[in-house]
Amino acid sequence: MAVVTMKNLLESGVHFGHQVKRWDPRMKKYIFSERNGIHIIDLQKTIVAIREAYEAVRKTTSEGKSVLFVGTKKQAQQTIQKEAERCGMFYINNRWLGGMLTNFSTIKKSLARLKKIEKMEVDGTFDNLTKKEIASLQKEKSKLEKNLGGIKEMKDLPGILFIIDTRKEEIAIREARSLGIPIIAVVDTNCNPEGIDYPIPGNDDAIRAISLFTGVIANAVIEADNEHGLKIIENLQEDEESGDSGVDPYQDREEEITDYSNYTPKDEASGDDEDEEDNSLVNDEDLYDDK
């Protein structure tokens, strides 16, 4: 079965870009046409890009490396967590702290602190503390969990990043590139696709589109894991014929096809410019920031 179909893309509104006046000229080769002042993305190129990204994830996972899902914009937060957890991978969906990759040794210390507090909750340590001390530790834990909960079990740097919105996740991209970590990213018509190893042209604002892209990447991880498990079984049963692995790499999502006549440019509906955050280098204040 196909990784994704044209019908899937159309139903999810993947083809809708931004208003023409907001485009990035470097996206020209991915744009099919313009209608009602909106750029329409070439879905034939999107399908090819998705297949390439899918294979990259399968290869990375089959080598025993992890995938880090990154999407901190509101539309992406829930889907990023859900799909990363579904395939057993890691995610950042609240805020990218500067140094998350390039200063991973410091991040690991914060993760150790989070696990220590969790252990204190269950081993009876809290029984010997005052209410004020307990409240302070619980507050610390909550804020660590909020920023780092999605990578709590990540022991090493990821093998590949999957990113929603390259403009918002600019720091994550810069860190990954400096470390030579491959990047898969959804690039909308207002984004710069340069420097992305596997750019996927598509709508990075619509929840349905984000869900489709993220689900496909998660399915690639699951398929690779299933194939790995099958190989183990085959090695244990060398004298028996192996069965068909038959994994469905994509579960169809039944959504309404968006009508151009009822379409409101996303720049007008929700506002395209987002407040920039100061995500410089990670420090204790960053980890406990309520943002």
Curated annotation (Swiss-Prot):
One GO CC term, this protein: cytosolic small ribosomal subunit
Annotated region (Disordered), positions in chain: 235-291
Superkingdom in the source lineage: Bacteria
Pfam families linked: Ribosomal_S2
Transmembrane segments: none
Residue ranges with Acidic residues bias: 270-291
GO biological process, one term: translation
Sample GO molecular function, one term: structural constituent of ribosome
Keywords noted in UniProt: Ribonucleoprotein, Ribosomal protein
InterPro entries xrefs: Ribosomal_uS2 (IPR001865), Ribosomal_uS2_bac/mit/plastid (IPR005706), Ribosomal_uS2_CS (IPR018130), Ribosomal_uS2_flav_dom_sf (IPR023591)
PROSITE patterns assigned to the protein according to its UniProt record, in alphabetical order: RIBOSOMAL_S2_1, RIBOSOMAL_S2_2
PANTHER family found in the cross-reference section: 30S RIBOSOMAL PROTEIN S2 PROKARYOTIC AND ORGANELLAR (PTHR12534), SMALL RIBOSOMAL SUBUNIT PROTEIN US2M (PTHR12534:SF0)
Family of this protein: Belongs to the universal ribosomal protein uS2 family.
Protein name in the entry: Small ribosomal subunit protein uS2
